[in-house]
């Protein structure tokens, strides 16, 4: 790790290690809950609701976390919510009930929101204008790598047993150690922030808000019900793990190239192109990959799909930042994060009901969301000029759960 970054933020290695462990456990938990829910006889709509519960918890937690940090500080907030997040997976094991699982997953989302905000506010406080983009991009790429690692844990244990939940609890609990033991001083608690309504954001950047919401629908639905889709295709546990990991790997590989293109070209064209490619990859998978297809064909299609959908939020945020002033950016980011979180909560619910109606319900939901981005983007492209190059902000890779400091500060309420 570059010495200049650790000099700016001495706790950077500890923050990244804690974040890596958190995201590894969270990704593994999301996948195992979907598969275990099906084993336990949950309906697809109920499994979707469990996934939606996480994002509902993230939104609520983000509304409250900044106030808690202001009251007790970064390290105590992280340790307290981390302890609860480490215990929550065991609730799924102890009580096999879809409604209890929804509540437990929402509790996990609430705790993770607070933990993410602690890490992101710590990074933002130590970063300068010269290195902030680099630090946050390293943070985002760390989250993507952790997502890949979490998916690949699936074949190491039996999803019908108790061990997966114990492993998840251990991983999340271990995330507390690097940050709780760091010798670097924690930053000052975040201050109060301004608020920008979603209505105003939509007027300033309609495509940014729409892409943020629909991108949330897509990623929320895919990462909740993708394992069930793969299982219905006849894939083994190991193949399901590779299938899901390929989706995240595609995002890891494609994030920087898409970002560079968006910095040089009209961002709207990049957003439209990425959505069109995502829809095309899914359509190809439906047409050329029947249930008995070679797994590698599914891996290839899902890698392209993940490569196009995972950077959508980062592209939408960059597009939004081109339309608002620097002073309004924190509040505007919070509004976009709200739209993204709402979409990520709605996506699993919509896809769950769609899969209950037809085995291809997930694919239809994902394709529909991406086609809507394309249609809306084309409409906006011909109705408004592009942002001047001089006004374009730099692209930065966002983590897989992009709800953090900006949302918390812009929408925080007292603890």
Model-predicted segments: where are they?
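Helix-to-loop junctions at the C-terminal end of transmembrane segments
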Residues: 61-74, 154, 158, 254-266, ...
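Intrinsic disorder in cytosolic terminal tails and internal cytosolic loops
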Residues: 1-7, 187-198, 380-415
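Helix-loop boundary and gating motifs at the non-cytosolic
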Residues: 6-55, 208, 220-229, 233, ...
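C-terminal membrane-cytosol helix-exit motif in multi-pass small-molecule transporters
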Residues: 154-155, 169-190, 374-383
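Cytoplasmic helix-loop-helix junction between adjacent transmembrane helices
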Residues: 106-141
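Intracellular juxtamembrane helix-capping segments at the cytosolic ends
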Residues: 114-127, 310-324
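Paired small-residue
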Residues: 99-107, 296-304
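Structural signature of the two symmetry-related core transmembrane helices
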Residues: 76-91, 169, 269-284
